[in-house]
């Protein structure tokens, strides 16, 4: 890993400009330093104070505009000094190497004054500048080094001469570097080691870059890392040289010809100790970090415009990325993520994003572990319900870096307005939301869990505090794989506007409860009778004795009157997985809301949809097993 040609940083990667303030005792040469930099010669006549100088971005090494500000005690008040300190990004404290009084004032006046005027948690970086080195034969470093060790905010010390133009450009480069690539957040000089926040950030970067999850960065992974950070690959000999440096200092820094996490952290410690912390900062910023080593909002939440009546879905590239993420962490190749494997996956997150309810929202295996299909389903649900959170999660996984896209927004498809779908009588959507409505205890949970293939026996094992109000799984309609998202709507007198927004409604009543259907009928009349949202009535617990419903007309007559499909008998009290017929019907109705009620009542219509579902479920399963064998 070497710096090479640095990737052009985005505007959000670092500060938009740098403001350098020069302070110090009178006549130490502050103004001369600025004028020597600008004119490239020592000024014969020096004014009391130089005007503010702006160096354009195109002539600075870091391509950032730089403002240089002079301070004159004779011309400016204390209030003006305090204001300049508050506006500065870095402060150069200038002393004359031949003037002990000016050196003493560095610690007795200037550092305390600056620290009083800045926030304790975000101290300004300081540069100590020993001017007039042309007047002495000795160095002031022996005097200055103890000061540097005492104050961690001091980035570096530079001895220079405005008269001989010695180290003038270097001085301002170091000042600029102290702002854009500060040492403070990365390294603790007293302990001679990286700070915990830096180790944490670099560990996440290592985990993302270790694409086969074997605990080392092999040559291909190192080359990819080098290219995305520095826009240049490493020659085979250069790669070997890097590993040899690590081997020389660490017995466990290289394993199986790959760089271990310890070796990776050691390399960055070495960069920082050798004054090459811009290399580490380039890596950190490429992976989304700001100066405080937090992931930036611009990185986690890229701009994504979502017009009204549009939904959000993952596109093909996002699913490929998530499939590779699953494969990376499914170490035992059982097509499910164990708690330890899931924990390993979420190590690049600042928190565990999924609670125990997720295991009852998507498909799991017999041990309750999220399956391959369940994993993709949960991401589909998050994208649909809370796309900002999806962008955040993809950011933690390094989506834009590993796929070499501008941002996570490239993983999202924003569907067209639903009104256009209705006009054109076709939809391009792949995710359909079904609100499941009914009184408490009518069997809504049974409907949701049946979508995941769980019968009543399996449902009884679910703890109350682990229950989910959502369930999502794939459903095949006319040979097309779609996601059906069920949402259990709590019983209430009236539904909120948000509770009426969906693609299809499933009205559930309990055949053993005579008062159950009344609620379904009332909610239908209040909210859906005059809407264009298709509705399906489900007669739950159909394996039990049916009682007459206390309503003016029977459920069957109600459906006939309102031109709805007849009530669908449903039970989850089965030996095997419950029937998926109602889910095919619900998805079909969501896909084709314009289809006439006569068609919906036609057995031929449902037969075509169900036949397609059966054939493609079998084909899909066969393809899935083939993929697993390859994996």
UniProtKB/Swiss-Prot annotation:
Sequence ranges assigned to domain EF-hand in this UniProt record: 197-232, 317-352
User: Which positions does the record annotate as the modified residue N6-acetyllysine?
Assistant: 105
GO molecular function terms attached to this record: calcium ion binding; GTP binding; GTPase activity
Q: Which residues lie on this side of the membrane: Cytoplasmic?
A: 1-605
Catalyzed reactions? GTP + H2O = GDP + phosphate + H(+); ATP + H2O = ADP + phosphate + H(+); UTP + H2O = UDP + phosphate + H(+)
Q: Which UniProt keywords apply?
A: Acetylation, Calcium, GTP-binding, Hydrolase, Isopeptide bond, Magnesium, Membrane, Metal-binding, Mitochondrion, Mitochondrion outer membrane, Nucleotide-binding, Repeat, Transmembrane, Transmembrane helix, Ubl conjugation
Mitochondrial intermembrane face residues: 629-631
Q: DNA-binding: is it a keyword of this entry? A: no
Any one GO CC term of the record: mitochondrial outer membrane
What role does it play?
A: Atypical mitochondrial nucleoside-triphosphatase (NTPase) involved in mitochondrial trafficking. Probably involved in control of anterograde transport of mitochondria and their subcellular distribution. Promotes mitochondrial fission during high calcium conditions. Can hydrolyze GTP, ATP and UTP.
Which NCBIfam families does this one have? small_GTP (TIGR00231)
Domain statement: The Miro 2 domain is necessary for efficient ubiquitination by PRKN.
* Official protein name in the record: Mitochondrial Rho GTPase 1
- Which organism encodes this protein? Mus musculus
Gene name for this UniProt entry: Rhot1
């Amino acid at each position: 890993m070497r710096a090479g040609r640095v990737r052009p940083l985005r505007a959000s990667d670092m500060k938009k400009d740098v403001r350098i303030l020069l302070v110090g005792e009178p006549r130490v040469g502050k103004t001369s330093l600025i004028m020597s930099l600008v004119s490239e010669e020592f000024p014969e006549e020096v004014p009391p104070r130089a005007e503010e100088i702006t160096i354009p971005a195109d002539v600075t090494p870091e391509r950032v505009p730089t403002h240089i500000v002079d301070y004159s005690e004779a011309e400016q008040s204390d209030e003006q000094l305090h204001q300049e300190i508050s506006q500065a990004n870095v402060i150069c404290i200038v002393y004359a190497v031949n003037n002990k009084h000016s050196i003493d004032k560095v610690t007795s006046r200037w550092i305390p004054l600056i620290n009083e005027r800045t926030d304790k948690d975000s101290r300004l970086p300081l540069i100590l500048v020993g001017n007039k080195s042309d007047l002495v034969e000795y160095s002031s470093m022996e005097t200055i080094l103890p000061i540097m060790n005492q104050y961690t905010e001091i980035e570096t010390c530079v001895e220079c001469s405005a008269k001989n133009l010695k180290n003038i450009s270097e001085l301002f480069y170091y000042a600029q570097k102290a702002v854009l690539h500060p040492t403070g957040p990365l390294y603790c000089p007293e302990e001679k080691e990286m700070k915990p926040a830096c180790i944490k950030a670099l560990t996440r970067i290592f985990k993302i870059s270790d694409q086969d999850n074997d605990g080392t960065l092999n040559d291909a992974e190192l080359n990819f890392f080098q290219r995305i950070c520095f826009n240049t690959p490493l020659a085979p000999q250069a790669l070997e040289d890097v590993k040899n440096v690590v081997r020389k200092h660490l017995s466990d820094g290289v394993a199986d010809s790959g760089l271990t996490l310890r070796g990776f952290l050691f390399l960055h410690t070495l960069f920082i100790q050798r004054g090459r912390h811009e290399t580490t900062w380039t890596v950190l910023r490429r992976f989304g970090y700001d100066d405080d080593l937090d992931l930036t909002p611009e990185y986690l939440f890229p701009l994504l415009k979502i017009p009204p009546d549009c939904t959000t879905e993952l596109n093909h590239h996002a699913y490929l990325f998530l499939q590779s993420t699953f494969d990376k962490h499914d170490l035992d190749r059982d097509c499910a993520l164990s708690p330890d494997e899931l924990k390993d996956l979420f190590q690049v997150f600042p928190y565990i994003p999924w609670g125990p309810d997720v295991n009852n929202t998507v498909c799991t295996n017999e041990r309750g572990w999220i399956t391959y299909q369940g994993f993709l389903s949960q991401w589909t649900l998050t994208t649909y319900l809370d796309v900002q959170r999806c962008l955040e999660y993809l950011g933690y996984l390094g989506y834009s870096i590993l796929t070499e896209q501008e941002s996570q927004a490239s993983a999202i498809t924003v569907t067209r307005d639903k009104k256009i779908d209705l006009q054109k009588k076709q939809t391009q959507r792949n995710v359909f939301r079904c609100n499941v409505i009914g009184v408490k205890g009518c069997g809504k949970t049974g409907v949701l869990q049946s979508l995941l293939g769980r019968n009543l026996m399996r449902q009884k094992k679910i703890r109350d505090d682990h229950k989910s109000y959502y369930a999502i799984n794939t459903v095949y309609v006319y040979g097309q794989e779609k996601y059906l998202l069920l949402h259990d709507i709590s019983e209430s007198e009236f539904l909120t506007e948000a509770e009426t927004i969906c693609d299809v409604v499933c009205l559930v009543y309990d055949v053993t409860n005579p008062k159950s259907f009344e609620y379904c009928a009332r909610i239908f009349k209040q909210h859906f009778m005059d809407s264009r949202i298709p509705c399906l009535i489900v007669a739950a617990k159909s394996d039990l004795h049916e009682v007459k419903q206390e309503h003016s007309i029977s459920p069957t007559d109600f459906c006939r009157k309102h031109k709805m499909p007849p009530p669908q008998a449903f039970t989850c009290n089965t030996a095997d997985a419950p029937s998926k017929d109602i889910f095919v019907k619900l998805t079909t109705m969501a896909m084709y809301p314009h289809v006439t009620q006569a068609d919906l009542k036609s057995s031929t219509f449902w037969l075509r949809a169900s036949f397609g579902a059966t054939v493609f479920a079998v084909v899909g399963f066969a393809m899935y097993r083939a993929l697993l064998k390859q994996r």
